[in-house]
Amino acid sequence: MCWVAVDRAIRLAEKRSFPYDWDYWRTTRSKIFKDVYYNFWDEELQSFIQYKGSTTLDASSLLMPLVRFISPHDPRWRKTLKAIEKELVTETLVYRYNNEKSDDGIEGDEGTFSMCSFWYVECLCRGGQLEKARLYFEKMLGYANHLGLYAEEIGLRGEQLGNFPQAFTHLGLISAAYTLNRELEQAKKL
């Protein structure tokens, strides 16, 4: 997120013609990118990891192509997505991380994170896996309650868990729906 803050500050300054230290901001953004790209990569897992030095996957990595930190076609990203699919995705639902490998200080098991599931759909869209993205999106719609609302998490039996309704999840839903619609419309034109 540090990279996103600097990147968006640069974009905003350029768009609005605000004065800024061009060299310093761009150098800072580049340093952050290189640190994440090289030091948050695990060769053995072939994936970006939860934090520097860890060996744990984290579904928050799904934000990387969504915030344009990395191309959805970058080889490291494709490998990360495969690793997330293998370890954190069950059906259409995505766990934030593996509770058995990461001690978050919270007792008990976690459900799958609804927001991460919508990020996953959007990553599939941006990576060109439109049919899979559409299928997973439609399955996710089935987890909403009778009013179309989502909780923070979904349990193993499909029950809504955690904060309800959760705004972040609905933002993920809207973003995934928008991206899926845009990509499907563009595919029709080809």
Model-predicted segments: where are they?
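Long hydrophobic alpha-helical segments that form multi-pass transmembrane helix bundles
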Residues: V6, D23-R26, S30, V36
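Inter-helical turn/loop segments and adjacent helix faces that build the functional surface
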Residues: A9-R26
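Alpha-solenoid helical repeat scaffolds
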Residues: L12-K15, L130, Y143, E183
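Extended glycan-interaction surfaces of carbohydrate-active proteins
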Residues: S30-F113, L135-P165, L171-E185, K189-L190
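C-terminal substrate/ligand-recognition segments
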Residues: D109-Q129, H170
